[in-house]
Swiss-Prot record:
Gene Ontology terms: cellular component: cytoplasm
Organism listed in the record: Streptococcus pneumoniae (strain Taiwan19F-14)
Pfam families on file: Tyr_Deacylase
Classification via SUPFAM superfamilies: DTD-like (SSF69500)
Comment on protein domains: A Gly-cisPro motif from one monomer fits into the active site of the other monomer to allow specific chiral rejection of L-amino acids.
A GO molecular-function descriptor: tRNA binding
InterPro entries, per the entry: Daa-tRNA_deacyls_DTD, DTD-like_sf
Protein name: D-aminoacyl-tRNA deacylase
Function of the protein: An aminoacyl-tRNA editing enzyme that deacylates mischarged D-aminoacyl-tRNAs. Also deacylates mischarged glycyl-tRNA(Ala), protecting cells against glycine mischarging by AlaRS. Acts via tRNA-based rather than protein-based catalysis; rejects L-amino acids rather than detecting D-amino acids in the active site. By recycling D-aminoacyl-tRNA to D-amino acids and free tRNA molecules, this enzyme counteracts the toxicity associated with the formation of D-aminoacyl-tRNA entities in vivo and helps enforce protein L-homochirality.
C-alpha cells in the first residue's frame, strides 16, 4: 500500500456535485493498493495511521495522534500512486492492483480503520473532487513495503 497522509483542518469529497464524505480536523488519506498487498500491510497501515503523532500538543510539538485529538479520517482511493513515469510522457498504472482486488482491499482497510476512529470515504473508482485545508502543511508518504 502507498498512502499519502495529509493533516487537515477540514476536507470533503464530492461526486457529481454531491458531497460524499466530509470531515473536520483529522487526516486526509490518498490510498493506493498494490498487487502484492496482504493483510499484514493493511494491519500495519491502520496501526501506523491511528497512532502517528503528527498533531501539535499544547507546547506546539507534534506529539498527538488522530486518536488523541479525537479527529476524523477521510479516505480516498488513489490508484495513480502506483504510476510508472519512466518511459514516455503518459504514466502507466500497471503497478496498481487490479480493480476487483483493490476495491475489496480498500473496503477492508476502511472498515478496520473505522474500528479506531471515525472514517468517511469516497467511492472506489469514481471521478471525485477533493477539497481540503491542509494544516501545517504536514504531508507524509507511507509505503507498507518500506518498513
Amino acid at each position: 500500500m502507498k498512502i499519502i497522509i495529509q493533516r487537515v483542518k477540514k476536507a470533503q469529497v464530492s461526486i457529481e456535485g454531491q458531497i460524499q464524505g466530509k470531515i473536520n480536523q483529522g487526516l486526509l488519506l490518498l490510498v493506493g493498493v498494490g498487487p502484492e498487498d496482504q493483510e499484514e500491510d493493511l494491519d500495519y497501515a491502520v496501526r501506523k495511521l491511528v497512532n502517528m503523532r503528527i498533531f501539535s500538543d499544547v507546547e506546539g510539538k507534534m506529539n498527538l495522534s488522530v486518536k488523541d485529538i479525537e479527529g476524523e479520517i477521510l479516505s480516498i482511493s488513489q490508484f495513480t500512486l502506483f504510476a510508472d513515469t519512466k518511459k514516455g510522457n503518459r504514466p502507466a498504472f500497471t503497478g496498481a492492483a487490479k480493480p476487483d482486488m483493490a476495491s475489496d482491499f480498500y473496503d477492508a482497510f476502511n472498515q478496520k480503520l473505522a474500528q479506531e476512529v471515525p472514517v468517511q470515504t469516497g467511492i472506489f473508482g469514481a471521478d471525485m473532487q477533493v477539497e481540503l485545508v491542509n494544516n501545517g502543511p504536514v504531508t507524509i508518504i507511507l509505503d507498507t513495503k518500506k518498513r
